[in-house]
C-alpha cells in the first residue's frame, strides 16, 4: 500500500465523474481496506483491488493549506479550484486571485471591516499582489494603470445571478471616488464632487427600475449596464455615463412563480403619499393588481419597498437641485 495512505492523510477520491476531497479515516494492512471520509460527509470503503492512481491519490500540500493565488496551485483541476475557494470561504476570505483575475464568492452576510475607509486607504498605497486579494486591489490597479500606461482601462464583472455583480460594481465606484477626491493632494472642485455623487448615488434608481426578485436572487439585475468614467489629468472624475441594455421587458407583464415584477412598482405603492397615489389612481395594495401579484409573491422580508422609494425620491430631488 502506498506510503501516503496513513490515517489523517488528505487525498482526492474519484467518485464517478468527479473528484472529492477526503481524509483517510483508517487503513487495514491485513486486507488492504481503506476507509475514507469525504469532506461532504460520505464514508467510502476502498478495497485493495480497487486502489489505483485513478481512484485515490494524494492531495498536493498547496490544496491542503489553500492559496491566495490559484495559479500557484500544485494541481490544476476543477475540484482543486472549488476546494481552494471553499477553504478560503470558510475563513471569510471571499476574494481569491487567479493570476490577474479576481474570483469573488458571495458570503451572503456582512463581513466586519472588509470595506472600511481604513481598508480603502491601505489598498490605495500598494500595488496589485502586495496585499491579500481584494476588489479594492483591482480598482487601485485600474486607477494606477490610467497614468502608468496612458490608456483607457476596463473592468469586466461577470457571474451568475446572485453572485454579487451589482455590489461589486458599487464597491469599485466607491474606491475610485475616494481616489478621485484624494488625487493630486488638492481637494476636488464642486463640479467634480457633484459628478461623483451623481454616478455613485444613481444605484437606487437603477435598481428600482431594473432589478427584481427572482427565485435565485431577491435583488437580481434584469439588465446589463456599461459604466464609463472620465478622469482629468489630475486624477479627478470629470464626467461619466451609464448605458443600459438587454432589459428583460417581458417581466413587466409576466413573472415566474415566486418572483416579482420590478421593484419600482411595489416601492411606489408602499412609499407614495395619499395625494400621489390618488393622482395615479392607485387605490389598493400590490395584491390587487394582476401584473404585480400573478406569481403569488408581492412581499419579501429581505426587501424594504418603502425605504427604496425614499432612496429613489431623495436621489431624484438631489439631482434636480444639482442641475
Q: Predicted segments — roles?
A:
Residues 2-14:
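Short coil-to-beta transition motif at edge beta-strands of beta-rich domains
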Residues 4-6, 21-31, 36-323:
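N-terminal switch/interaction subdomains of large nucleotide-dependent motors and GTPases
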Amino acid at each position: 500500500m502506498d506510503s501516503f495512505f496513513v490515517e489523517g492523510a488528505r487525498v482526492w477520491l474519484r467518485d464517478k465523474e468527479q473528484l472529492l476531497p477526503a481524509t483517510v479515516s483508517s487503513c487495514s494492512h491485513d486486507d488492504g481496506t481503506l476507509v475514507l471520509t469525504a469532506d461532504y460527509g460520505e464514508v467510502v470503503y476502498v478495497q485493495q483491488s480497487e486502489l489505483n492512481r485513478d481512484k485515490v491519490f494524494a492531495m498536493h500540500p498547496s490544496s491542503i493549506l489553500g492559496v491566495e493565488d490559484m495559479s500557484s496551485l500544485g494541481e490544476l483541476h476543477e475540484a482543486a479550484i472549488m476546494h481552494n475557494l471553499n477553504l478560503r470561504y470558510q475563513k471569510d476570505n471571499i476574494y481569491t486571485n487567479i493570476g490577474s483575475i479576481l474570483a469573488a464568492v458571495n458570503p451572503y452576510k456582512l463581513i466586519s471591516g472588509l470595506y472600511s475607509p481604513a481598508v480603502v486607504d491601505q489598498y490605495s498605497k500598494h500595488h496589485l499582489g502586495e496585499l491579500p486579494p481584494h476588489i479594492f486591489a483591482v480598482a487601485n490597479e485600474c486607477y494606477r494603470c490610467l497614468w502608468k500606461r496612458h490608456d483607457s482601462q476596463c473592468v469586466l464583472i461577470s457571474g451568475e445571478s446572485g453572485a454579487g455583480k451589482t455590489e461589486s460594481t458599487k464597491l469599485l465606484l466607491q474606491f475610485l471616488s475616494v481616489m478621485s477626491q484624494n488625487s493630486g493632494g488638492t481637494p476636488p472642485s464642486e463640479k467634480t464632487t457633484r459628478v461623483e455623487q451623481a454616478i455613485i448615488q444613481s444605484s437606487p434608481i437603477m435598481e428600482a427600475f431594473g432589478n427584481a426578485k427572482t427565485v435565485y436572487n431577491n435583488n437580481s439585475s434584469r439588465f446589463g449596464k456599461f459604466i464609463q468614467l472620465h478622469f482629468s489629468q489630475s486624477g479627478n472624475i470629470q464626467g461619466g455615463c451609464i448605458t443600459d441594455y438587454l432589459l428583460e421587458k417581458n417581466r413587466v407583464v409576466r413573472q415566474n412563480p415566486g418572483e416579482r415584477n420590478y421593484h419600482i412598482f411595489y416601492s411606489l405603492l408602499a412609499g407614495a403619499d395619499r395625494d400621489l397615489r390618488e393622482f395615479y389612481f392607485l387605490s389598493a395594495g400590490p395584491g390587487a393588481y394582476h401584473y404585480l401579484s400573478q406569481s403569488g409573491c408581492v412581499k419579501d422580508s429581505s426587501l424594504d419597498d418603502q425605504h427604496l422609494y425614499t432612496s429613489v425620491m431623495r436621489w431624484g430631488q438631489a439631482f434636480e437641485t444639482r442641475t
